[in-house]
């Protein structure tokens, strides 16, 4: 989940489709999960599990999904722009797990696609890939070809796979699934399970209502503009990110 649909609408829609829970993973923000925690949790939908995650925008590895243990709060995970190598160290130092989202998706947003265009990063990425805990191998907004490549990547490094709907719009909710035991009721449960499970069943159906489906070749202009937006956003948050990073280094790294 990283769209603008209200979080309770996600829950209602997923429950109607037979889902028992979801991972909330907004881009560089926990606002969606906060809405659940502050306004809904304990009051409604107590038969539905909502877990906390984030889709972090790195400066060199595209989008990375991050899940931290219950109670761990790091402001830096809402300040986009860290290098992938630093993000891995921070997440693991605090007991979390992480993995690339849609690794063969759009350039600048996806780990492999980003770095295929930057030969100087290839060795760095080769060193980084084994350190991830999982790979998103099915994304409902990606093609069968790119999802197949992501699955082969996970198999190469013996990593479990996740499925994600990447639902920015209401009609995309529930297009993908990840099969998990009913015993997983918290982030800690999920982290422990992923660390000990080499294979996780996941999949879904392709969603053909994405922006790139609707505007065709013009989508490349949008993707290129994202590159400049990402650079500006990273620079804007540089001071805050540096301050948070120094604090983490003193405590953990």
Language model features with spans:
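An N-terminally biased module of ancient metal coordination in phosphate/nucleic-acid-related enzymes
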Residues: 1-59, 81, 248-252
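Beta-strand-turn-beta hairpins that frame and shape the catalytic cleft
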Residues: 46, 59-64, 93-96
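Short, basic, helix/turn surface patches
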Residues: 48-57, 129-134, 185-200
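Domain-core and long-helix interface of multi-subunit machines
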Residues: 1-2, 71-175, 214-217
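Short, hinge-like loop/turn segments at secondary-structure boundaries
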Residues: 39-43, 67-70, 115-119, 178-182
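Short glycine-enriched loops at secondary-structure junctions
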Residues: 54-60, 104, 167
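A basic- and aromatic-enriched beta-loop-alpha substructure that forms the phosphate/nucleotide-
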Residues: 57-74
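C-terminal functional module detector
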Residues: 87-96, 149-160, 165-253
